Structure formats: C-alpha cells, structure tokens
C-alpha cells in the first residue's frame, strides 16, 4: 500500500472515517421486524454512508450498508464496519480461509475450514503497526467469551472478511527497539 502511495492518496477517506456526521435517521416497524436506518455524511469525500439495522423477534439483527459516492471521489480500496465488544469477548470460531492471515490477493496458501483462535493469537507484531490477522472467504464468525456467549455473524451472500484485534490500529505503537 505504501509502494503505490495509497496513504497519501486516500487521506480524504481516512479523515471522513473519523469525522462522519449523522445526516438522517429513519425508523419503521412492522409485524415481523423493526428497521433503523442511519445516514452518515462524509464531508471530506462528499459521500453518504447508509447503515440499516433490521431487528427480528428471534434476536437476529440484519445489517446492510451502502455507500453513495460522487464520480470524482478518491479511489476507495474497500469499505467495512468496525465495532468494539467487551474485552472478555475474545474467543473466535469461524468457517473460512485460515488459520494464517490472508487477503483476497494472497490467500491460495490458506485452506477453507473450521478454525478456533483468540483475539490475542491474531496479533502479528509488524515493525510498522498495521492491520493483521485478516481472514477471507468467511461463511460465518462467532465471537464469544469463555462461556460461549457473544455474537454470531453470518455472511448474507458470497463471503465476508474480518479481523479481530485487541486494539485499534491507530492506537498500536511500534514494536521494534530503538
């Protein structure tokens, strides 16, 4: 990413991810579900990001995201959702490519299967702090505490990708000695 100048060319998206503002909220309720849609304005890229949560009586929540960009918006390498869970929710099980980290452009050496790990085991101490522990072609992911209580994520169609980290990338310091 540094070789092609991505950190410089993508600053608008990075700033937008830190400064998004709520532009609107819509709710609706039916006999079968309740829907909450939040629209965020990303000022730096003149874009809108819509996140829709549909809640079902079973406890299931369906999350759908949609990004509206302008034709002159900077290139966007990918888009996703990050969220925090309690620190004791550190157990992970998934069905996808693993067990090593892998990305869509370099995942042929990892096999599709069922894997178990922890958030701590996903950490890779790269010299320059960066995303790590990424997994591709995931069908489902369970994040739980040691008692097995937590969240289950199921890909709607195709697959999903994920990584689990104890810290935000921006909060990690360099690990090399000076």
Q: Where are the predicted features?
A:
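Beta-strand/loop-rich accessory regions of lumenal/periplasmic or secreted enzymes
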Residues: 1-177
